[in-house]
Curated annotation (Swiss-Prot):
Protein S19 forms a complex with S13 that binds strongly to the 16S ribosomal RNA. InterPro entries: Ribosomal_uS19 (IPR002222), Ribosomal_uS19_bac-type (IPR005732), Ribosomal_uS19_CS (IPR020934), Ribosomal_uS19_SF (IPR023575). It holds the Pfam family Ribosomal_S19. Gene3D superfamilies: 30s Ribosomal Protein S19, Chain A. GO terms for cellular component: cytoplasm; small ribosomal subunit. One of its GO terms (biological process) is translation. It comes from Hamiltonella defensa subsp. Acyrthosiphon pisum (strain 5AT). Keywords: Ribonucleoprotein, Ribosomal protein, RNA-binding, rRNA-binding. NCBIfam families: rpsS_bact. This is Small ribosomal subunit protein uS19.
Length: 94
């Protein structure tokens, strides 16, 4: 058995407390704001909306069952891809 299977998943304590508190208050549907991109998604988070910080703003992500055992940071991209710059058409005509 590999070492990684022996160890449990990593979740920051403050995020774990917020998830437990939100599970108690089912009527409270506000997203949980977090800066912890390194935390692993565990089954108690399913159905919650978590706002993950991407370096500039908090990106709201609805947690589904397919996301379990992934990291929160995977769902809040930090870089924006604007595409390659198109060549100047006037320069090509000359």
């Amino acid at each position: 058995m590999p070492r990684s299977l022996k160890k449990s998943f990593f979740v920051d304590r403050h995020l774990l407390k917020k998830v437990e508190k939100s599970a108690e208050n089912n009527k409270d549907k506000k997203p949980i704001r977090t800066w912890s991109r390194r935390s692993t998604i565990f089954p108690e988070m399913i159905g919650l909306t978590i706002a993950i910080h991407n370096g500039r703003l908090h990106v709201p992500v609805f947690i589904s069952d397919e996301m379990v055992s992934h990291k929160l940071g995977e769902f809040a991209p930090t870089r924006t891809y604007r595409g390659h710059v198109a060549a100047d058409r006037k320069a090509k005509k000359r």
